[in-house]
Curated annotation (Swiss-Prot):
GO terms for biological process: riboflavin biosynthetic process. (2S)-2-hydroxy-3-oxobutyl phosphate binds at S85, T86, R127. Catalyzes the formation of 6,7-dimethyl-8-ribityllumazine by condensation of 5-amino-6-(D-ribitylamino)uracil with 3,4-dihydroxy-2-butanone 4-phosphate. This is the penultimate step in the biosynthesis of riboflavin. It comes from Clostridium novyi (strain NT). This is 6,7-dimethyl-8-ribityllumazine synthase. The keyword NAD does not apply. Its EC number is 2.5.1.78. The lineage of its organism: Bacteria, Bacillati, Bacillota, Clostridia, Eubacteriales. 5-amino-6-(D-ribitylamino)uracil binds at F22, A56, F57, E58, A80, V81, I82, F113. The keyword Nucleotide-binding does not apply.
Length: 153
């Protein structure tokens, strides 16, 4: 029996990162966490490319453009959608989630969901490096594992 499982050491792999600028205070913390994880797992600076987009809604399109180039072994999507007093949150978070999943399935490149969808700013801050860890860091570790796993299969 053969079992496939990605490891967490990155050698010679390239990573694209897409970051939403809206709620930049949170996005920049997620990006810092992702970069920290990538570097700790052996990724060199010249193996990372970052694209900033206006907001979370634009993330799937740029992620798809990056994935279709086949330059990247994985694409990491980072940002924050924080609930307000209107239904806007529901529409944006739903479409971003579906869009990122579809990019991964359509391109067969791991596209990792590191977009926070929270009820308030406090929850976002907790998930961007305080009480609840850094979801950007976690997304980058997932990207490494998935890039390695797909290269094995």
């Amino acid at each position: 029996m053969r079992v496939y499982e990605g490891n967490l050491i990155s050698e010679g792999k390239k990573y694209g990162i897409v970051v939403g600028r809206f709620n930049e205070f949170i996005g920049s913390k997620l990006l810092s966490g992702a970069l920290d994880a990538l570097k700790r797992h052996g990724v060199k600076e010249d193996e990372i490319e970052i694209s900033w987009v206006p907001g979370a809604f634009e993330i799937p399109l740029v992620a798809k453009k990056m994935a279709k180039t086949k330059k990247y072994d994985s694409v990491i999507c980072l940002g924050a959608v924080i609930k307000g007093s209107t239904a806007h949150f529901d529409y944006v978070s739903s479409e971003v989630s579906k869009g990122i999943a579809n990019v991964s399935l359509d391109t067969e490149v791991p596209v990792i969901f590191g977009v926070l969808t929270t009820d308030n700013i406090e929850q976002a801050i907790e998930r961007a490096g305080t009480k609840a860890g850094n979801k950007g860091y976690e997304a980058a570790v997932t990207a490494i594992e998935m890039a390695n796993l797909l290269s094995e299969i």
